[in-house]
């Protein structure tokens, strides 16, 4: 279903993101008492009165200042209005009409998009009507008093909004694969998003921390619909101050946790840092599918063997993700960027894959024939009876043995390696659960025909 879009527009610090959270009944938009917190355009779904729609939050719009990120923010607002079915101009009732409001109103009057004025910070219902009346002079119709913090007036505002929206274009809902672009600040995540999407979807700058929130972008490649999230750069905790970066990093970690696949971006010049290793550990810990993208490869002086030497060095430091595909790209030139989708889709498919118990046990049987389970000094030897896949996302196998303590880390790694060699699973972590089981209980299952033992006592 293609949803109509509402663009939230206004000066910096008038409460746009707070209003977005109120209308969407969420706290996904970062709210902080400082101008310029929102820079890129961010999307959230909402519903009211049985009608679904999409709200796009935009950065504070300023026409008479070109400092820092303001021109880029302006470009993002212009793009948001182009795709919107309705514009919601948010103004500050306590400040009254400002020159900035007048400039934005003039621009909106020249656009073809229907506009509704939401006069925010009207906590008093009675006083709010008086405060809102001043905004008639913007020439965009009746202003509506609301309080984004307390919620007063927002229900009436939503009633008005859904009355102005076109009917939803109902199509068969396509499954979306969620891909999160993860990495330290300034490794080229936003440049990669722009290269992937073919538009300037995110603001790019040499200044670390340009992206302060997680940005969602929908892209269709072949028959696959992707939801791509560019996340805020993640730094060491001691370097992160409470504020926009703190909230953005929390969003980034949440993006990892709910992703189908993570794209871990590494700077080819800097190599793998301690923070990159921690991010790799987080991805593995959460059981996410992953591919590793080495960006800025165009800046590396190389010969025919460089790529092999560099990959070996990088993998030695990213041992958490030994199962991940590694791709060397340039987000700036577009070199090998399209390969990301191919390998990400393979990783997702492996992450969701299920294998029949009979196939698992064939692999285990062969593995044991090549290398028997270890024997302790006491003379007691490990017995691997059988295994079965109990879940996917990530693929999880339970291996039933006589005593899990008899199987050390070396043999456990050997079994995982054999499963990967025989069954694949590139791009996804595997979880092997070693469970002790009594021979008597096993015999009953064998008698019922439920299982066939790989190894007997």
Swiss-Prot record:
The protein, known as: GTPase Der
NCBIfam families: GTPase_EngA (TIGR03594), small_GTP (TIGR00231)
Protein's UniProt keywords contain Plastid: no
Family matches, as Pfam families: KH_dom-like, MMR_HSR1
KH-like domain sequence ranges: 353-438
UniProt source species: Prochlorococcus marinus (strain MIT 9312)
Gene responsible for this protein: der
Cited InterPro entries: G_ENGA, GTP-bd, GTPase_Der, KH_dom-like, KH_dom-like_a/b, P-loop_NTPase, Small_GTP-bd
The entry's keywords: GTP-binding, Nucleotide-binding, Repeat, Ribosome biogenesis
């Amino acid at each position: 279903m293609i949803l109509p879009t509402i663009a939230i527009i206004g000066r910096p610090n008038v409460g746009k993101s707070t209003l977005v959270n109120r209308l969407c009944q969420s706290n996904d938009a970062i709210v902080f008492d400082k101008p310029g917190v929102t820079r890129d355009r961010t999307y959230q779904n909402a519903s009211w009165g049985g009608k679904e729609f999409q709200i796009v939050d935009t950065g504070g719009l300023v026409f008479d200042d070109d400092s820092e990120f303001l021109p880029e923010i302006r470009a993002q607002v212009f793009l948001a209005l182009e795709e919107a079915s309705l514009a919601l101009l948010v103004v500050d009732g306590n400040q009254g009409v400002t020159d900035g409001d007048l400039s934005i109103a003039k621009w909106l009057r020249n656009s073809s998009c229907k506009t509704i004025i939401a006069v925010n910070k009207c906590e008093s219902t009675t006083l709010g009507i008086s405060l809102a009346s001043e905004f008639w002079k913007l020439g965009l119709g009746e202003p509506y008093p609301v309080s984004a913090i307390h919620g007063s007036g927002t229900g009436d505002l939503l009633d008005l909004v859904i009355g102005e929206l076109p009917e939803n274009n109902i199509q068969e809902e396509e499954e979306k694969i969620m891909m999160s672009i993860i990495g330290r600040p300034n490794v080229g995540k936003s440049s990669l998003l722009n290269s992937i999407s073919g538009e300037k979807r995110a603001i790019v700058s040499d200044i670390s921390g340009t992206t302060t929130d997680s940005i969602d972008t929908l892209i269709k490649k072949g028959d696959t619909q992707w939801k791509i999230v560019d996340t805020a750069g993640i730094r060491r905790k001691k370097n992160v101050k409470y504020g926009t970066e703190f909230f953005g990093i929390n969003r980034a970690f949440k993006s990892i946790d709910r992703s189908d696949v993570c794209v871990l971006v590494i700077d080819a010049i800097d190599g793998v840092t301690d923070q990159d290793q921690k991010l790799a550990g987080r991805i593995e810990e959460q059981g996410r599918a992953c591919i590793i993208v080495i960006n800025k490869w165009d800046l590396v002086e190389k010969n025919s063997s460089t790529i092999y030497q560099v990959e070996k060095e990088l993998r030695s430091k990213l041992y958490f993700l030994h199962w991940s595909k590694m791709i060397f790209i340039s987000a700036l030139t577009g070199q090998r960027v399209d390969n990301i989708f191919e390998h990400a889709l393979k990783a997702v498919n492996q992450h969701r894959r299920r294998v029949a118990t009979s196939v698992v046990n064939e692999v285990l049987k062969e593995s044991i024939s090549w290398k028997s389970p270890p024997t302790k000094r006491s003379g007691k030897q490990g017995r691997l009876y059988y295994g079965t896949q109990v879940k996917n996302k990530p693929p999880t196998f339970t291996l039933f043995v006589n005593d899990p303590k008899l199987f050390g880390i070396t043999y456990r790694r050997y079994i995982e390696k054999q499963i990967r060699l025989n069954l694949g699973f590139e791009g996804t972590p595997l979880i092997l659960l070693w469970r002790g089981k009594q021979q008597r209980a096993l015999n009953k299952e064998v008698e019922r025909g439920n299982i066939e033992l790989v190894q007997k006592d």
